[in-house]
Amino acid sequence: MVGESLTKEKITMKKDTKLRDDQFELYDLTVVVESISGNCTCNMKVGDKFHLKGGKLSMPDKSDFCLYALQSTLPLLPAKQRKNHPADWMETDARVVCPDPECKLIMRIDRDNLRVLNHDDVSPIKWEK
């Protein structure tokens, strides 16, 4: 249901190594269609998904994903990629709805692997300590 929380083990993942000052961690995310209880005119199916790794979005096996459902997740994804305070709602809430009220499509944002990124690999502005 909407508002169910992520499992504790996904929330409390700890980094294994000490990060350099120019490094940071992001979760890889999978956004999966969890339920559809209305008329989805974009032919989405339960189980349809996309992945976010770093700043790159991909869909398995060249599959399609509804633009309108996708756009409803975009503002949340950068915050879901990061570790937040345990009481922050971004740590407990994982469901997003399609903006089409007749579709009644619910997606779930799952955290996958935790990856380490280097500042200079993802920004044209060089890291200065």
Where are these regions (language model features)?
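N-terminal amphipathic/basic-hydrophobic helices that include classical n-h-c signal peptides
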Residues: 1-12
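Short alpha-helix capping/helix-loop boundary micro-motifs
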Residues: 34-39
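Helix-coil modules at protein/domain termini and other flexible surface or pore-lining loops
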Residues: 22-25, 55, 96-100
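Acidic, aromatic-enriched beta-alpha/helix-loop junctions
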Residues: 48-88
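Short, basic/aromatic beta-hairpin or loop at an interaction surface
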Residues: 18-31
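Structural beta-strand/beta-sheet cores of well-ordered domains, especially the beta-sheet scaffolds
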Residues: 27-29, 48, 105
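Short, compact, well-ordered microdomains
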Residues: 84-128
